[in-house]
Amino acid sequence: MGVPTSDWIYWCRLCARDDVVYKVRERDDDLVRIISKCFDVEMTLEEPELGSMLCEECYSVIGQLITFSDSVSKVQAIFELLRHSEPQDSQDLDALRLEYGLPPACKQDLEFLDIDDTEDRCSLVEELTISDHSTSPSPDFEAQTVRTRANLKQCNSDPKVLASPTASIPEVETKRSRRQQFAAKRNSKVYTATESDDEEAILDEDEAVSPPPLKRKRGRPKGSGKQKNVDDSDNVTSREPDDNAKSKQDDKTSELSMSPHGSQSSNFVDYPCKICNETFMSFMALRRHKHDMHGGPKKYVCDHCGKGLKTFTSLVEHQLVHTEEKPCICPVCNAGFKNKARLRVHSQTHGEPKFECNVCGKKLQTRAILNKHKYVHTDERRFKCEVCGSGCKNSTALKIHLLGHTGLRPYVCKYCGKAFASNTNCRSHKWKKHPELASKEDETESSRVPVPTLEELRAITREMAKAKQD
């Protein structure tokens, strides 16, 4: 859960809660599309822009809507394929479902529908004889209650009653009534009277006959005050588990809460992706990452490198990688970036360190840097070199290592022309060999140079290894 705030611009855009955990951005096209389609709320598109924050509850609901929408699209594609297939064609339906990312066919076991016929018929007799509380009571209500009890006793003891025309109503209707009763019992949270309470109420009505009730307002149930007194003790006990459950939930989510300055507490919990080892702050963020990056068909293919992407927006953003265009410029150091998301992450490096390591206490500017730093305290080397087999603790170290295999030295000292594989070594060289010139450098001047990505370096070194084997 997020930290409550009094600034309304940071409230949840859908429910106005102040404990927000997620900010909707322009690149979250699925979120923006679903919210616009279902609720007619144009997030990130207003002029002037309103708040685009979501609380954990709303973010979870929208995530389920996105997943359900994708599932519906897959199902419609399957139906279109089956509709245009010939009747004599044999289709492996299970394989077809798996091809479109759907689980194998399964039947849901509804236990509450497996009810004894005797119980169904007895409950039907009870429904037919007891008048509804929402209707105005008849004058002979007490006599009708006595008849109801007699009918119930006869239903439980005499098998002839079960064979009567009243009890021989089709089984479908009885199951439907039982299903409605089950849904009503499950949805009720406050007024849950037990069978013993109902029997006591009937006995009280038999012993003391109340005067004819006064005419009440329309829609108000008869005996609401009495029902409230009967269930008063149950209400007290029923609220206690809710409070306990809420306190447990708060304790569980407090570990993920952030400080008022935006920094994460030392007791943070990471949710790692088992496929790419990227970590996330919440389970919902991890699930969305798996859905966007590792799940579903990738129908948009890049013309330059053949990479498949799930959305057209992702394709347009990816195609910037193959160009020199960097439309997003940092106002502090004039560094250029392909999209606003990378610029937003980079802008955090110019601020005060906010993310604290819970092992050594070191503070870092961004969460990504913190995640890389945490592997300093472990012996795990997840990133392996395919050429020499050596391991690195993070992707940056592997990238520098692969640059050494390729012989590329993209970082060049502008004072003496010496080239380096990493920008850190280049900056260190400037301060050691050219301290006077380095101190006069313009800090706003961008020092970034085009460097191959980690995937491109892996492809280059893989081809080099094949060439050596041949």
Curated annotation (Swiss-Prot):
- Return the Polar residues bias intervals: 255-265
Instruction: Please note every region of biased composition (Basic and acidic residues).
Output: 237-254
List of residues that carry Phosphoserine = 168
> Annotated region Required for homodimerization: where?
1-103
The C2H2-type zinc-finger regions cover: 271-294, 300-322, 328-350, 355-377, 383-405, 411-434
Q: Which InterPro entries match?
A: Znf_AD, Znf_C2H2_sf, Znf_C2H2_type
Keyword annotations? Cell membrane, Developmental protein, Membrane, Metal-binding, Phosphoprotein, Repeat, Zinc, Zinc-finger
Spell out the GO cellular component terms annotated for this protein, sorted alphabetically and separated by semicolons. Answer: cytoplasmic side of plasma membrane; cytosol; nucleus
Q: Which residues bind Zn(2+)?
A: 12, 15, 55, 58
Q: Where is this region: Disordered?
A: 156-265
According to its UniProt entry, one GO biological process term is:
dorsal/ventral axis specification
Give one GO molecular function term: signaling adaptor activity
- ZAD domain spans which residues? 10-82
SUPFAM superfamilies associated with the record: beta-beta-alpha zinc fingers, Glucocorticoid receptor-like (DNA-binding domain)
Q: How does it assemble?
A: Homodimer. Interacts with Myd88 and Toll.
The record's PANTHER family line, in alphabetical order, gives:
KRAB AND ZINC FINGER DOMAIN-CONTAINING, ZINC FINGER PROTEIN WECKLE
Name of the protein in its database record:
Zinc finger protein weckle
Which species expresses this protein natively?
Answer: Drosophila melanogaster (Fruit fly)
Q: What is the lineage of its organism?
A: Eukaryota, Metazoa, Ecdysozoa, Arthropoda, Hexapoda
